[in-house]
Amino acid sequence: MEDDSLYLGGEWQFNHFSKLTSSRPDAAFAEIQRTSLPEKSPLSCETRVDLCDDLAPVARQLAPREKLPLSSRRPAAVGAGLQNMGNTCYVNASLQCLTYTPPLANYMLSREHSQTCHRHKGCMLCTMQAHITRALHNPGHVIQPSQALAAGFHRGKQEDAHEFLMFTVDAMEKACLPGHKQV
Protein backbone atom coordinates (compact mmCIF):
# COMPACT_ATOMS: atom_id res chain seq x y z
CA MET A 1 0.00 0.00 0.00
CA GLU A 2 1.40 3.37 -0.97
CA ASP A 3 1.83 6.14 1.54
CA ASP A 4 -0.79 8.89 1.05
CA SER A 5 1.87 11.51 1.82
CA LEU A 6 3.43 10.72 -1.58
CA TYR A 7 0.29 12.04 -3.24
CA LEU A 8 0.86 15.79 -3.33
CA GLY A 9 -1.19 18.31 -5.26
CA GLY A 10 -3.12 15.68 -7.19
CA GLU A 11 -0.13 13.65 -8.42
CA TRP A 12 2.42 11.15 -7.15
CA GLN A 13 5.77 12.71 -6.37
CA PHE A 14 8.87 10.63 -7.12
CA ASN A 15 11.03 13.59 -6.09
CA HIS A 16 9.65 13.39 -2.55
CA PHE A 17 9.59 9.58 -2.39
CA SER A 18 13.14 9.16 -1.14
CA LYS A 19 12.42 11.19 1.99
CA LEU A 20 9.83 8.62 3.02
CA THR A 21 11.70 5.40 2.26
CA SER A 22 15.11 5.97 3.76
CA SER A 23 16.10 3.24 6.18
CA ARG A 24 17.90 5.84 8.32
CA PRO A 25 16.09 8.96 9.52
CA ASP A 26 19.33 10.96 9.36
CA ALA A 27 20.31 9.78 5.84
CA ALA A 28 21.87 12.43 3.67
CA PHE A 29 20.04 13.28 0.48
CA ALA A 30 21.85 14.11 -2.70
CA GLU A 31 20.07 16.25 -5.22
CA ILE A 32 20.76 15.39 -8.79
CA GLN A 33 20.00 18.25 -11.15
CA ARG A 34 19.57 17.61 -14.83
CA THR A 35 19.49 20.26 -17.48
CA SER A 36 15.93 20.93 -18.57
CA LEU A 37 15.05 21.05 -22.24
CA PRO A 38 15.03 24.45 -23.94
CA GLU A 39 11.60 25.74 -24.95
CA LYS A 40 12.03 24.89 -28.63
CA SER A 41 14.17 21.78 -28.29
CA PRO A 42 13.62 19.00 -30.85
CA LEU A 43 12.37 16.97 -27.89
CA SER A 44 9.98 19.66 -26.73
CA CYS A 45 6.27 18.80 -26.84
CA GLU A 46 5.54 22.10 -28.57
CA THR A 47 7.92 21.45 -31.44
CA ARG A 48 6.34 19.81 -34.48
CA VAL A 49 8.57 17.83 -36.77
CA ASP A 50 7.13 16.83 -40.15
CA LEU A 51 9.40 14.02 -41.29
CA CYS A 52 6.90 12.30 -43.53
CA ASP A 53 3.40 13.16 -44.71
CA ASP A 54 2.38 9.51 -44.32
CA LEU A 55 2.75 9.54 -40.53
CA ALA A 56 -0.42 9.84 -38.48
CA PRO A 57 -0.64 12.72 -36.01
CA VAL A 58 -0.02 11.91 -32.37
CA ALA A 59 -3.36 10.86 -30.90
CA ARG A 60 -2.37 10.87 -27.27
CA GLN A 61 0.35 12.37 -25.15
CA LEU A 62 1.34 10.40 -22.06
CA ALA A 63 2.24 13.41 -19.99
CA PRO A 64 2.60 17.13 -20.55
CA ARG A 65 6.11 18.51 -20.43
CA GLU A 66 5.57 20.12 -17.03
CA LYS A 67 4.81 16.68 -15.54
CA LEU A 68 8.20 15.29 -16.60
CA PRO A 69 10.72 16.46 -14.00
CA LEU A 70 14.28 15.84 -15.06
CA SER A 71 15.67 16.16 -11.54
CA SER A 72 15.26 13.92 -8.55
CA ARG A 73 16.18 13.68 -4.91
CA ARG A 74 17.50 10.31 -3.93
CA PRO A 75 18.76 8.93 -0.65
CA ALA A 76 22.44 8.12 -0.31
CA ALA A 77 21.30 4.64 0.81
CA VAL A 78 21.25 1.74 -1.65
CA GLY A 79 17.95 1.05 -3.45
CA ALA A 80 16.27 -2.32 -3.82
CA GLY A 81 18.46 -5.06 -5.23
CA LEU A 82 17.25 -7.60 -7.76
CA GLN A 83 17.83 -11.31 -7.32
CA ASN A 84 19.60 -13.04 -10.21
CA MET A 85 17.37 -15.94 -11.24
CA GLY A 86 19.92 -17.72 -13.41
CA ASN A 87 21.67 -15.55 -16.00
CA THR A 88 19.18 -12.70 -15.64
CA CYS A 89 21.66 -9.90 -15.00
CA TYR A 90 20.65 -8.41 -18.38
CA VAL A 91 17.06 -8.13 -17.07
CA ASN A 92 18.18 -6.69 -13.74
CA ALA A 93 20.42 -4.04 -15.33
CA SER A 94 17.62 -2.87 -17.63
CA LEU A 95 15.03 -2.85 -14.84
CA GLN A 96 17.28 -0.80 -12.55
CA CYS A 97 17.71 1.81 -15.31
CA LEU A 98 13.97 2.02 -15.92
CA THR A 99 13.05 2.02 -12.22
CA TYR A 100 15.26 5.00 -11.41
CA THR A 101 14.26 7.16 -14.39
CA PRO A 102 12.27 9.96 -12.68
CA PRO A 103 9.69 10.68 -15.43
CA LEU A 104 8.88 6.97 -15.82
CA ALA A 105 8.79 6.40 -12.05
CA ASN A 106 6.44 9.39 -11.63
CA TYR A 107 4.11 8.01 -14.29
CA MET A 108 4.14 4.51 -12.80
CA LEU A 109 3.57 5.75 -9.25
CA SER A 110 0.60 7.83 -10.47
CA ARG A 111 -1.19 4.59 -11.46
CA GLU A 112 -2.69 6.59 -14.33
CA HIS A 113 -2.44 3.71 -16.81
CA SER A 114 -3.57 0.86 -14.56
CA GLN A 115 -6.71 2.75 -13.51
CA THR A 116 -7.96 2.65 -17.10
CA CYS A 117 -6.30 -0.54 -18.38
CA HIS A 118 -8.70 -3.35 -19.20
CA ARG A 119 -6.01 -6.04 -19.44
CA HIS A 120 -3.93 -5.95 -16.27
CA LYS A 121 -2.52 -9.43 -16.96
CA GLY A 122 -0.33 -9.41 -20.02
CA CYS A 123 0.02 -5.61 -20.05
CA MET A 124 3.67 -4.55 -19.91
CA LEU A 125 2.84 -1.14 -18.39
CA CYS A 126 0.85 -2.74 -15.56
CA THR A 127 3.63 -5.30 -15.00
CA MET A 128 6.29 -2.58 -14.99
CA GLN A 129 4.19 -0.43 -12.64
CA ALA A 130 4.00 -3.30 -10.15
CA HIS A 131 7.77 -3.82 -10.36
CA ILE A 132 8.69 -0.13 -9.99
CA THR A 133 6.27 0.36 -7.10
CA ARG A 134 7.66 -2.70 -5.30
CA ALA A 135 11.27 -1.69 -5.93
CA LEU A 136 10.75 1.86 -4.66
CA HIS A 137 8.90 0.66 -1.56
CA ASN A 138 11.64 -1.81 -0.57
CA PRO A 139 14.92 0.14 -0.51
CA GLY A 140 17.87 -1.87 0.72
CA HIS A 141 16.08 -5.19 0.25
CA VAL A 142 16.56 -7.84 -2.43
CA ILE A 143 13.45 -8.45 -4.49
CA GLN A 144 12.75 -10.97 -7.22
CA PRO A 145 11.73 -9.44 -10.57
CA SER A 146 8.45 -10.70 -12.00
CA GLN A 147 8.92 -13.55 -14.45
CA ALA A 148 6.34 -11.84 -16.68
CA LEU A 149 8.91 -9.11 -17.43
CA ALA A 150 11.22 -11.57 -19.19
CA ALA A 151 8.56 -13.89 -20.61
CA GLY A 152 9.79 -13.43 -24.19
CA PHE A 153 13.37 -14.40 -23.35
CA HIS A 154 15.00 -17.77 -22.66
CA ARG A 155 15.37 -18.70 -19.01
CA GLY A 156 18.82 -19.83 -17.97
CA LYS A 157 20.45 -18.36 -21.06
CA GLN A 158 22.40 -15.10 -21.13
CA GLU A 159 20.70 -12.49 -23.33
CA ASP A 160 21.51 -8.95 -24.44
CA ALA A 161 20.56 -6.09 -22.06
CA HIS A 162 19.98 -3.62 -24.91
CA GLU A 163 17.71 -6.08 -26.73
CA PHE A 164 15.72 -6.67 -23.54
CA LEU A 165 15.47 -2.93 -22.86
CA MET A 166 14.20 -2.24 -26.40
CA PHE A 167 11.70 -5.12 -26.13
CA THR A 168 10.40 -3.74 -22.82
CA VAL A 169 10.14 -0.11 -23.94
CA ASP A 170 8.44 -1.21 -27.18
CA ALA A 171 5.92 -3.32 -25.24
CA MET A 172 5.20 -0.41 -22.88
CA GLU A 173 4.69 1.91 -25.86
CA LYS A 174 2.29 -0.55 -27.52
CA ALA A 175 0.31 -0.77 -24.28
CA CYS A 176 -0.32 2.99 -24.60
CA LEU A 177 -1.62 2.83 -28.16
CA PRO A 178 -5.41 2.74 -28.42
CA GLY A 179 -6.74 -0.41 -30.06
CA HIS A 180 -3.36 -2.18 -30.02
CA LYS A 181 -3.25 -5.75 -28.77
CA GLN A 182 -1.37 -5.92 -25.46
CA VAL A 183 2.03 -7.62 -25.43
UniProtKB/Swiss-Prot annotation:
| Boundaries of every USP domain copy | 80-183
**Top-rank taxon:** Eukaryota
Gene Ontology biological-process entries: protein deubiquitination
The record's PROSITE patterns line, in alphabetical order, gives:
USP_1, USP_3
Where in or outside the cell it occurs: the entry states: Nucleus; Endoplasmic reticulum
Q: What Gene3D superfamilies does the entry give?
A: Cysteine proteinases (3.90.70.10)
Give TM regions: none
Q: Identify the main location.
A: nucleus
Keyword rRNA-binding in the entry? The reply is no
Question: Which of UniProt's keywords are assigned here?
Answer: Endoplasmic reticulum, Nucleus
The yes or no answer to whether the keyword Nucleus is present is yes
State a single Pfam family of this protein. Answer: UCH
Give any Gene Ontology cellular component.
nucleus
Molecular function, one GO term: cysteine-type deubiquitinase activity
Family to which this protein belongs: Belongs to the peptidase C19 family. USP17 subfamily.
Protein's UniProt name: Ubiquitin carboxyl-terminal hydrolase 17-like protein 23
The organism of origin for this protein: Homo sapiens (Human)
